[in-house]
Amino acid sequence: MARKKFSGLEISLIVLFVIVTIIAIALIVVLATKTPAVDEISDSTSTPATTRVTTNPSDSGKCPNVLNDPVNVRINCIPEQFPTEGICAQRGCCWRPWNDSLIPWCFFVDNHGYNVQDMTTTSIGVEAKLNRIPSPTLFGNDINSVLFTTQNQTPNRFRFKITDPNNRRYEVPHQYVKEFTGPTVSDTLYDVKVAQNPFSIQVIRKSNGKTLFDTSIGPLVYSDQYLQISTRLPSDYIYGIGEQVHKRFRHDLSWKTWPIFTRDQLPGDNNNNLYGHQTFFMCIEDTSGKSFGVFLMNSNAMEIFIQPTPIVTYRVTGGILDFYILLGDTPEQVVQQYQQLVGLPAMPAYWNLGFQLSRWNYKSLDVVKEVVRRNREAGIPFDTQVTDIDYMEDKKDFTYDQVAFNGLPQFVQDLHDHGQKYVIILDPAISIGRRANGTTYATYERGNTQHVWINESDGSTPIIGEVWPGLTVYPDFTNPNCIDWWANECSIFHQEVQYDGLWIDMNEVSSFIQGSTKGCNVNKLNYPPFTPDILDKLMYSKTICMDAVQNWGKQYDVHSLYGYSMAIATEQAVQKVFPNKRSFILTRSTFAGSGRHAAHWLGDNTASWEQMEWSITGMLEFSLFGIPLVGADICGFVAETTEELCRRWMQLGAFYPFSRNHNSDGYEHQDPAFFGQNSLLVKSSRQYLTIRYTLLPFLYTLFYKAHVFGETVARPVLHEFYEDTNSWIEDTEFLWGPALLITPVLKQGADTVSAYIPDAIWYDYESGAKRPWRKQRVDMYLPADKIGLHLRGGYIIPIQEPDVTTTASRKNPLGLIVALGENNTAKGDFFWDDGETKDTIQNGNYILYTFSVSNNTLDIVCTHSSYQEGTTLAFQTVKILGLTDSVTEVRVAENNQPMNAHSNFTYDASNQVLLIADLKLNLGRNFSVQWNQIFSENERFNCYPDADLATEQKCTQRGCVWRTGSSLSKAPECYFPRQDNSYSVNSARYSSMGITADLQLNTANARIKLPSDPISTLRVEVKYHKNDMLQFKIYDPQKKRYEVPVPLNIPTTPISTYEDRLYDVEIKENPFGIQIRRRSSGRVIWDSWLPGFAFNDQFIQISTRLPSEYIYGFGEVEHTAFKRDLNWNTWGMFTRDQPPGYKLNSYGFHPYYMALEEEGNAHGVFLLNSNAMDVTFQPTPALTYRTVGGILDFYMFLGPTPEVATKQYHEVIGHPVMPAYWALGFQLCRYGYANTSEVRELYDAMVAANIPYDVQYTDIDYMERQLDFTIGEAFQDLPQFVDKIRGEGMRYIIILDPAISGNETKTYPAFERGQQNDVFVKWPNTNDICWAKVWPDLPNITIDKTLTEDEAVNASRAHVAFPDFFRTSTAEWWAREIVDFYNEKMKFDGLWIDMNEPSSFVNGTTTNQCRNDELNYPPYFPELTKRTDGLHFRTICMEAEQILSDGTSVLHYDVHNLYGWSQMKPTHDALQKTTGKRGIVISRSTYPTSGRWGGHWLGDNYARWDNMDKSIIGMMEFSLFGMSYTGADICGFFNNSEYHLCTRWMQLGAFYPYSRNHNIANTRRQDPASWNETFAEMSRNILNIRYTLLPYFYTQMHEIHANGGTVIRPLLHEFFDEKPTWDIFKQFLWGPAFMVTPVLEPYVQTVNAYVPNARWFDYHTGKDIGVRGQFQTFNASYDTINLHVRGGHILPCQEPAQNTFYSRQKHMKLIVAADDNQMAQGSLFWDDGESIDTYERDLYLSVQFNLNQTTLTSTILKRGYINKSETRLGSLHVWGKGTTPVNAVTLTYNGNKNSLPFNEDTTNMILRIDLTTHNVTLEEPIEINWS
């Protein structure tokens, strides 16, 4: 609670009073003599000594010589003021000023103190009379004779006390520590030496002779109101005493004064005395851990002075000196002994450990309700709502505000109904005023009657102060009557408001006026001769008068016990209100032993970063003091917090033992949900409070051990790692018990913490991964929503499935986290009871377990079980961290019974974590869980992937492991050792936008001899480009290497925000690796922390684990399924003129994959590298990239769905091209047309058969001798034919190969202009063309058909040059040749570019000899076709030079795979420049981003059944690769097709985006018109369906052009939550709504298909098929393909025609497929179908359709294209409309309503509506309603 706000008058009076006080003190100092400064009062706090000092001594102390005056051991003789020589002389001390005022100028010498007289041995120690050495007095009333007694209480505990033998002085009436009566012990860990003249005492550890406590350093001063003793300590490492703000856990020895006197004072950057009175400190002696503690049992005001050496001096204002010295072998033992002395901590109720919300001044109950509501809604784990004094009526205890908090009892019931608790505040001060309604205040009246108040010095008049309710009296909680009254008041109020716990505040005791309403008497109690360095230097400042009387004594003596006594009284009250329950007590003021009764918070802190940091020290100090349930006000009490501060504090506060968010009046709310339901603060708070609740069984067990054994809960690091001196100063991190290390972020704007990691094995709590750190300081990256949590190896942690309250979570299954330590062992324990009954431990009503792990066996041993209700709970999960080998078997046994196999377990190799689930190990029984560990073959990473066969000798020479496997195993026999660590991480720098790390080659570990020499220094850059996309790049920072010159669409600077990022990245060490983790699931989705990483000049290798076996992509290589086969398969990638075949690298190069994760999320990974490579897939699951050059430049896309991940990839590589509308029509081609007549004959046959058909091609046979830009003799009339069919709505596409003949005897402009413009690929550093041979024939050569292929090439093929399409001049030259051919020779509408891998019919060059073997035969040759024949096989030499557009020279070695890509954009641009239309470009060779410029066909396939399903795989893969316009040669390219195969392929091919029938020369015709009428009819029907659906299909093409994504869509993209779809590849979707299920097997008339979980309609009939979420066998007659429309979608259609020119003029139709709720949506994109960039220029029509029950509406989103003849709506077909008959259909259009004719099939729920006569066009909105 905050300080009172004083009025101006009050402030003026206070200032005046302070001035007067200062003057008075000055006078006292000046007049200081033997006579007391004030009159004595008759009933002194101590009986006056028999002998008093009445005269000044005649001599002063003799100063030591300078050599014997080490300044750090000076004991100050004038502690209360600035010293003067005169005062020093009066006190008989040595005056020797120094150049630093911190060092005493006046200090004691040997003339002060006491001498020993008559020392005797007693039954429990020694006893001696001490006589004062005659010397000047300091503060008067010295006691000349005192009694010194010692007690050897235990082997570890020694007590000595110094009292007045003649007069009883005040001694603390501690309620637990009683007078020791023996027996004594003889075998102690300590010796005690007493020096006699002068007296001093030494406590010495026997084992090493080290002096622990030595008072010889200074004199004993013992007067009535001033006691002083000093001790030298053996170590500089001192911890404890309080309550003050120390900032650091280890005490600063630099002349620090720490006053102790309980005070209502908020913590600050000063030495102010605060709320508690704690005199215990601990000192660690050395790295053996030996430590000791010192406790002074004294409650009077005092100060403790700490100075170098070190020396501790006590200056106490009364009572006695009563010291306890406690010895331990460890710091933890010392604290245990202290707690056993003053009282072990209370066992909290389980719910006390839940999170609490509070604030001062909610203002009304409605506000409290809103706070509770929003935090419930945010899912914040939250057990307790607290209200401060604002709930009270006029701040009076035991009342509530009936206006602002009306309904409070009902609200409390709501909390209870939700499993939550309610805690109220009670202040001790009781108002003497009346209630708001004028009635008497019953609480006050009953207290008066029972005489329960603290009285004035007369002992009978209640002292009156002022607190929150105004004028108040103060209960005397040391009075038994008061305790009864207090308990009764608590009980009465509980009957009205059923609170669950009590928060007692202001109990220092606090008053807002000094002393009382009457002031305070001038006497030695209110104005003692010595006042410690307390705030205001006034004893009764902000409290009551020191001469006030309580049952235990004068306020002067018992003031600091007020909170202690109130806690004891409140404990008794709780027992009355909650019989036999623990409840909850939170106190602000404390004393030694308060932890037996109450928890404590650190008071009214400030919302500042430094106070958050200091809270850790405060918490650790109270752990020493025996109050483990402690915490600070999370987010700060005073001042406005900030989101960042509060977020970081919530992270820390989630691990305070007492976790409460509380703030003050007048500031913004700071409960987590106040910051927004989706704020980073809420997410982070929810995450870490969820972790807290998960760990509550562990935390509760720690409290059990604190309660029974005195162990600390929030534990200083030094308590566990005392051998390491670095731990002695750690106070910005702490432990829970021995096992959980908590490292918060404590600095504003920081995301990296310099953290010390002690000497143990540590695991990241959240991932379970083992950390490489040990006994070192690290820069721990902790971004905005993270706190460091690490589990210590060697410990077993009990956990429980969390919930939002402990009421709920306690019912959930339990689990264990086993963090394996040294030798793979671990231990732990677990305590469980009902969580609320008092004394369950003492009564034995609990369950106790011990856990241990060794030899791969977990023993779960129940050592006590007497809580029957608890046995319904069970350990359901066991998570074992640090298992380096795979686990293949788990076995479980109960009570030493035989082991049984347990199958529900998973091993996470990335994190080396075994998770065993579904165990059902009920509490109360013993169990054993056993697992095996094997180094699985699947964990082998191939060390010898080379082309030659591996042998054991070669393997061991390489430094790898050789082990043969079974005959069936495909695992490598030569593999990397698991410890392979090729590179070490020199440094890793984390920032908000990425990571930079430097790697150094480990030459000492570089025994792995890979194919080429390694690069010694590497750099890793990770860039968080977007929230869902990141890049990680590994390169040589000292030498620029080739990087792919393909432009990508990535932000120039990262635009991600930490809070919204979907991923976290970590650089791993030993070995180096990168781990990327999906935040939402914690799943590691990239993990290259594996052996085998290599970065050589011509060999780069990196492996990564995969999150599942479901991976798709990589190409272009023929695959047998859409999902990759991970059974040790390697696929090479290097563009080659290679017809598709299993594992044969083919035309394109696409190093991209998409992976599904076990949770159903998806991500994509793209490696931007264009060098030859291969990728190995293994069942780990894992993959390994090997590439022969460039760098590693990865991009990852986080999805989280397959379609979204694909869109994210397309966003980077560019959205797919928008084809012309006509390009979606059916197309015909073949290689081998003899002349134009054959083409004409085909065309006429198709038209006669009325088979829809849009595009005709000719292959290279139309050319003269296969020369580009020529027309052969047999095709001289081709241009006229093309003009004719184009006039009939057809389109024409020609083929162009890149190879340009250089052997022409006549003018060949293409070559000649190419030479002039320097466009051809050349040998490096020369002007010579690198010649090759492809299709062009030599002029004037007769082809000998009998020659072999190679002989024919040599004999008849011309030398050809390859254009270098990287050059700007080449693009210009290419465009000119295309334009000239179009304008001068023949028209065309699209271009087909082939042979652009680039393909050559010779190896490298015309001589078959290249000039650089290192490039053509690299040290490592990827697993490619013709692996031993060199990279130049059937292409050009790798050393050929190409020139990028910026003039950079590059090797063909690096850019070979970019050749087709480099040709596509120039071809696309030239086509559009030439025709002025959109057109289409079809390319055989492709690279990522190619889809921006054109389409792709799947190459020269075979007329075989197995090539049909592979075409679906290929299309779906190219959909991932960003090329939506794809298809295969329908009916097959090679070999003669056959009737049934071609039938089924025509049915399938009708739904390829690129639908072309194409075959090779010298095989039979296979066009639809070439078979028979039945075939023609089938083709006509199926193509009519395609043409009908073209508006829908075109709209889908637009969607992915605008937004990325897939048109040919795998089922898993839409139905990823249905696991069967993950394997489906013989079906596919058009967009989201149209499913195609072809027949892919010969001579069958059924097809087995998976029907996803949605409503589906048979396209042919419109009927609901009534099947979903299962496999189904469908009929499929020879002329039928199964097509289904998904419910919930609207498909725009159009009547078909001969070609799209005519179909676009037909009526449109809408297929409305209703979902289960009679809802559906769809859209139409429409433009002129051929203009360039219509979408980009807004020249299009966009219509949105919606079905809502019985009403269909359209909404015009864009009206940039209007052609009413193309968009006339002719009909509407509603499928699945429902069973209600339709009586009427109404059209609302252009403001008019009209009835429409309709036809209804009620049985099949189909409604057909006719609009043909109403001239409705889709450019205007429509509404159609049926009823």
Swiss-Prot record:
Carbohydrate attachment residues: 99, 437, 455, 823, 855, 904, 926, 1235, 1303, 1340, 1354, 1403, 1535, 1572, 1675, 1748, 1763, 1815
Subcellular location: Apical cell membrane
Outcome (variant: residue 341 to P): In CSID; causes loss of anchored SI from the membrane
Phosphoserine: residues carrying this PTM: 7
Similarity comment: Belongs to the glycosyl hydrolase 31 family.
Other remarks in the entry: There is a high degree of homology between the isomaltase and sucrase portions (41% of amino acid identity) indicating that this protein is evolved by partial gene duplication.
Name by which UniProt lists this protein: Sucrase-isomaltase, intestinal
Organism from which the protein derives: Homo sapiens
Gene for this chain: SI
